[in-house]
């Protein structure tokens, strides 16, 4: 999928792709986090949390996008790519995003419980990592947060 030439990729448009994935996660009983990886206007991969369905603790939306995007590009370095994710990345995902050499990460809602891009820790700012990845927070924040609140309010994780 690519966006039409006449339609510049905006953070809001791209985050809507990630939100669509987050809704799929909720329908599957997964924590509703979605992500979309773009190279320019080209969508490389969009996915959502699949930990429950895959029985894989690393099957976060961000990790799945990195894996599939790197495979499509034929290499693990994701220079020039931007990942949009509905929730602030956790320690595992923030580390993987930095190590992938991603150009930019854009996230919607902060995660006061596990967010590692400023909420509980700021991994990207750690000088030991020498990260060039740029980070943008708060795109469609209320929509992203509302989806998560609704999911947890209705006890959608009863099978955990």
Show which residues each predicted segment covers.
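Short beta-strand scaffold segments in enzyme catalytic cores
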Residues: 33-41
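A cytosolic small-molecule/anion-sensing beta-strand core signal
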Residues: 39-40, 67, 79
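Immediate flanking context of iron-sulfur cluster ligation sites
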Residues: 75-88
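Glycine/small-residue-rich phosphate/adenosyl-binding loop
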Residues: 45, 62, 66-71
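A short, polar/charged loop-to-alpha-helix boundary motif
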Residues: 53-63
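Small-residue (primarily alanine) positions within well-ordered alpha-helices
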Residues: 18, 22-25, 35, 61, ...
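Short beta->alpha transition motifs characteristic of CBS
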Residues: 44-51, 134
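Zinc-dependent deaminase
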Residues: 1-25, 89-160
